[in-house]
UniProtKB/Swiss-Prot annotation:
Subunit and interaction comment: Homodimer. Part of the ribosomal stalk of the 50S ribosomal subunit. Forms a multimeric L10(L12)X complex, where L10 forms an elongated spine to which 2 to 4 L12 dimers bind in a sequential fashion. Binds GTP-bound translation factors.
Function: Forms part of the ribosomal stalk which helps the ribosome interact with GTP-bound translation factors. Is thus essential for accurate translation.
Domain of life: Bacteria
Gene that encodes the chain: rplL
CDD domains, per the entry: Ribosomal_L7_L12 (cd00387)
UniProt keyword list: Ribonucleoprotein, Ribosomal protein
SUPFAM superfamilies: ClpS-like, Ribosomal protein L7/12, oligomerisation (N-terminal) domain
Organism lineage: Bacteria, Bacillati, Actinomycetota, Actinomycetes, Mycobacteriales
GO MF: mRNA binding; structural constituent of ribosome
Keyword Endoplasmic reticulum: no
Protein name: Large ribosomal subunit protein bL12
Gene Ontology CC terms: cytosolic large ribosomal subunit
């Protein structure tokens, strides 16, 4: 098997959907017995590191779909609006797999707008 360069891997990842990337990460974690989560010590040290900096507002948010509610079809439509390039099948799998992150690293305005749209469609959503 030919060895792929970093650039070739990045290009391959660019062509994958959000769900395909999520499945890849899960399989990668299982095969290599690692986790993609940030170390707890690094996360715990950050808030106390600069006293006043902890009071600053977060500028990146994850929009997490906690539950689709009774109106799944409406929620699926909104998910397709929010996540560009997502097909009907992928959006359905994402909604049915709740709780799942819909957007990651979104600005406050984008995260709030997505949360509002999803809640109007009947979903339970949280920002992290």
């Amino acid at each position: 098997m030919a060895k792929l360069t970093k650039d070739e891997l990045i290009e391959a990842f660019k062509e994958m959907t959000l769900i395909e990337l999520s499945e890849f990460v899960k399989e990668f974690e299982e095969v290599f017995d690692v986790t993609a989560a940030a170390p707890v010590a690094a996360v715990a040290a950050a808030p106390g590191a600069e006293g006043g900096a902890a009071a600053e507002e977060k500028d990146e948010f994850d929009v997490v779909l906690e539950d689709a509610g009774a109106k799944k079809i409406g929620v699926i439509k909104v998910v397709r609006e929010i996540v560009s390039g997502l097909g009907l099948k992928e959006a359905k799998e994402l909604v049915e797999g709740a709780p799942k992150a819909i957007l990651e690293g979104a600005s406050k305005d984008d995260a709030e707008a997505a949360k509002t749209k999803l809640e109007e469609a009947g979903a339970k959503v949280s920002l992290k």
